Amino acid sequence: MDSSCFLVYRIFRFRKRNKNISSSLSSSSPPSSLSQNWLHPVFLSFRGEDVRKGLLSHIQKEFQRNGITPFIDNEMKRGGSIGPELLQAIRGSKIAIILLSRNYGSSKWCLDELVEIMKCREELGQTVMTVFYDVDPSDVRKQKGDFGKVFKKTCVGRPEEMVQRWKQALTSAANILGEDSRNWENEADMIIKISKDVSDVLSFTPSKDFDEFVGIEAHTTEITSLLQLDLEEVRMIGIWGPAGIGKTTISRVLYNKLFHQFQLGAIIDNIKVRYPRPCHDEYSAKLQLQKELLSQMINQKDMVVPHLGVAQERLKDKKVLLVLDDVDGLVQLDAMAKDVQWFGLGSRIIVVTQDLKLLKAHGIKYIYKVDFPTSDEALEIFCMYAFGEKSPKVGFEQIARTVTTLAGKLPLGLRVMGSYLRRMSKQEWAKSIPRLRTSLDDDIESVLKFSYNSLAEQEKDLFLHITCFFRRERIETLEVFLAKKSVDMRQGLQILADKSLLSLNLGNIEMHNLLVQLGLDIVRKQSIHKPGKRQFLVDTEDICEVLTDDTGTRTLIGIDLELSGVIEGVINISERAFERMCNLQFLRFHHPYGDRCHDILYLPQGLSHISRKLRLLHWERYPLTCLPPKFNPEFLVKINMRDSMLEKLWDGNEPIRNLKWMDLSFCVNLKELPDFSTATNLQELRLINCLSLVELPSSIGNATNLLELDLIDCSSLVKLPSSIGNLTNLKKLFLNRCSSLVKLPSSFGNVTSLKELNLSGCSSLLEIPSSIGNIVNLKKVYADGCSSLVQLPSSIGNNTNLKELHLLNCSSLMECPSSMLNLTRLEDLNLSGCLSLVKLPSIGNVINLQSLYLSDCSSLMELPFTIENATNLDTLYLDGCSNLLELPSSIWNITNLQSLYLNGCSSLKELPSLVENAINLQSLSLMKCSSLVELPSSIWRISNLSYLDVSNCSSLLELNLVSHPVVPDSLILDAGDCESLVQRLDCFFQNPKIVLNFANCFKLNQEARDLIIQTSACRNAILPGEKVPAYFTYRATGDSLTVKLNQKYLLQSLRFKACLLLVEGQNKWPNWGMNLVTSREPDGHIVLYTPSSHLQGPLLMENLYTFEFELVVTSSEFVLEFRADRYKCALGRFDKFGVHVVWCHLDQYESKSPSCKPFWRDFPIVISNGQNILDAILKTPMPSINQ
């Protein structure tokens, strides 16, 4: 729904006012697994006869390899019910893993375990994981199939209450997304994945991990009080303090303790380092920040964020916990948390920074300052790292205090010094004291450098490489770049980690900002006044000086220039700038996060030389057409020259045997690629948007270790060489929008490791070679927009591992081969926009198909009767199939079908009967089915139906509601603009969330209109009308209405039903209102109402808008004003309206209407003089409504 809402009511209070309204809302927090003291890491629930000798033993072995000891009830004597020892084991396990196998339901013991596990999940926050072993999750969920047969036998003779508990537990367990063994080619890989998931959960536990953080509990307690988690408002707080004080640690501990109480959560760390400022394109920077936020928050890697409103759209109704760590600019906050309105009720945003002014500038009122620890706490912190306990070992008491004093109170310095002295003798400590005294001078940099000085030369060199060039790389990447160094990479990294100079996390190298600064300062001091004599250059001014004045030397091995740091002017690089840098190995001129700013680096006289020892060449927007003539790429590991003026890389056939990664994307003038004869180690080749590239060299076939080839938008590429068939290790091939590509070579079928093929937008492609059937590992094929493609090869049926096949807008495709019925693993088939497609083949064997898209297949006249065999199909799109005459009656036999879209099927006259067989159908859309006359009466028997859209069905006469006294719960019925609809409604709406839209249905009879208005459960509706019905107690003409109530109802929660008639308005806005709760007048407050999105649309005259809202009465007389807004701009005026009161009171949650309930469960809507009236309500005794 749009970020706006429907109406704003302004309420002015007169006369009576309660002046003693002040309190605070409190509620019990949901259970969190983080608050438990777990006895076991993992509890395994399983049916022994199915898994003990196979799956279970392999899981145990993998767990043992990873140091995980699960609780398994092998040794327990089993009786009629699970005993106290097993109950204790279940309740005392942090994670429960349920191995659901075919005979799991045959054991009462297993079923009782399952009930207890699901109870612990609900009450204790226990993490529950599921593994479906040779069993369909749907069979478990619905107790059907072989699983259901076994389960039913177990239920025979059991009490009904027990059976219902078992069923509920099985359904709940099956709804947990778990591993399905049938989806894994290799069971061992599945078990490794399970073990990793368990390890991740166990490693994300603060119960023991944070014991060494002295004073952490005091910090988190203070911050939790600022967060006020019991309030439903959205709140931002700041954590402020100097670098190295422990802000990041505190925020992580806090996040770990609280994240289970929120729907979504994320920690965005190192923001200052990863997204530095300033930059030339601030908007692109904001988009990238927001993409990072959403990718982590909703766990979707390839998020598309086209504008800065996406975060609000995706998160406005989600309760989130967000930690933004190391923020140093308002731009960063504007991109990720500009306003509390971006997030759903109850959300908490924690901003961690060193800049107090930044917090205040962003309007953050609640700020926690992290102070230095006391002397005793500092000693404890030091001892935790030096001795592994909070006090000194015997005999080390005095010397430990001395070192603590010298190291200062900064936690980072205490950690580094403690790690350095760990396991040293007292004599070694004593020898270190004099050096420490002379080098520290109360400066944390000296403390850190003291630890650095203790390293061997090789480890020092590795430390400087990382701080200056590789601090955000993965370990294996660093190993490749430094392969020629004599140091043992893994051993060196471990030494640095042991001394707390870096950390190794899931294969990534992480380093504290102060340690990075230490390394940069060490390098800077190698030659303060002559930067060309240093090992590394990272400072913009220093680099400019060296490149323009030819002052580089053989000492220099790395240059890293972030071009966004060049704020003014350009850099004119001398022709001989690199001539003296004969040992240069790493050269990086780059723009941050794709910021394609103006040209900054120029070579007016060209370039005569680049070091032959280069291992990394990363030069974006390189201004010349070729690299220097004498350039030798023999040692190159990675070359990235995106967005450059290159026409070719170099002359001749140079050896590139060490090359692993090549990226020449957006080199629009590139006509020639280098010879790949020696590129046997090349793994990735990216050539995106190389518009002048006509062909690939035949030598590409020698790159036999190539894993990914990306040729997106190479619009001049006519063909691929036949040698492409030699790339037997290729896994991904992207040819998107290669609009000149006519065909693929017949040798293409030899690329047998290929898993993903993207041909989308290859508008000239005439055919796909039949040899594609040989690629047995192929899982995804995308050929959207291949408008010249007439048919698919019949061999496509041999790709039995195919899961996704997209042929969207293949307008010439007339039919699909019958062999497609062999694609038994196919899950997603998209044929939308295939205008020439007349019919589908039998898809009876495609039993795993979940989504079928056939929208705008305007020539399609029928569906195959065998569609009923696609038993897992849950979504079917047939929108715009204007020639579709009928649906096969078998369609309702697809019991898993949840969504069916038939919008614009203008030839469809009726739906098949027996629609009630589609028991899981939730959404049925028939909008603009102009030939449809009536709905089958049995449609109202589908209890799960939640959305039915028959709007603009101009011929629809009857909904067949009369014979069905109860419609499905929570139904949204949209019958707007059904101009022929003549409907009697003789039914009862049970659920208060029902939404009805009969806008412009002017033939709707008066009985039906009265029933909709007067049914207490129907809270949201639009229906035709010219006056406000007499049902509404308070009615008025004008722009306001005064409500008078007896004083005894003060501080009661009242539900109001309103009816509004629009006298004028703008109808161009599809969504309108204002998503804001804000104080207006000193004496008044605003109440916000958000209706269903299905009632939003153009503002309509001659129609009545009815809805309900709730508020707390604080005065015996008040005025209501109604208006329609969009982003604070008035769009319409309501001239006639009425209000009817439904009584409620808060003390016992009772009412005269069964639909009425305490208002805060629906809306946080009451604000008065800056105070939340609800606070007072909860602590003020309520008079009974009947007094």
Curated annotation (Swiss-Prot):
GO molecular function, one term: ADP binding
Residues at the active site: 113
Gene3D superfamilies registered for this protein in UniProt: Helical domain of apoptotic protease-activating factors, P-loop containing nucleotide triphosphate hydrolases, Ribonuclease Inhibitor, Toll/interleukin-1 receptor homology (TIR) domain
Reaction equation(s) it catalyzes: NAD(+) + H2O = ADP-D-ribose + nicotinamide + H(+)
Pfam family, one: LRR_3
LRR repeat start-end pairs: 498-522, 611-633, 635-658, 660-679, 680-703, 704-727, 728-750, 752-775, 799-823, 824-849, 870-894, 895-918, 920-942, 953-974
PROSITE patterns reported for this sequence: TIR
InterPro entries: Apaf_helical, C-JID, Disease_R_plants, Leu-rich_rpt_3, LRR_dom_sf, NB-ARC, P-loop_NTPase, TIR_dom
Enzyme class: hydrolase
BP terms from Gene Ontology: defense response to bacterium; signal transduction
Record keywords: ATP-binding, Hydrolase, Leucine-rich repeat, NAD, Nucleotide-binding, Plant defense, Repeat
Keyword Transcription regulation: no
Domain of life of the organism encoding this protein: Eukaryota
Every NB-ARC domain range: 217-478
Domain TIR: 38-202
This enzyme's EC code(s): 3.2.2.6
Matches recorded under PANTHER family: ADP-RIBOSYL CYCLASE_CYCLIC ADP-RIBOSE HYDROLASE-RELATED (PTHR11017:SF333), LEUCINE-RICH REPEAT-CONTAINING PROTEIN (PTHR11017)
Domain statement: The TIR domain mediates NAD(+) hydrolase (NADase) activity. Self-association of TIR domains is required for NADase activity.
Role this protein plays: TIR-NB-LRR receptor-like protein that contributes to disease resistance induced by the Pseudomonas syringae type III effector AvrB. Acts additively with RPM1 to generate a full disease resistance response to P.syringae expressing this type III effector.
UniProt-recorded name of the protein: Disease resistance protein TAO1
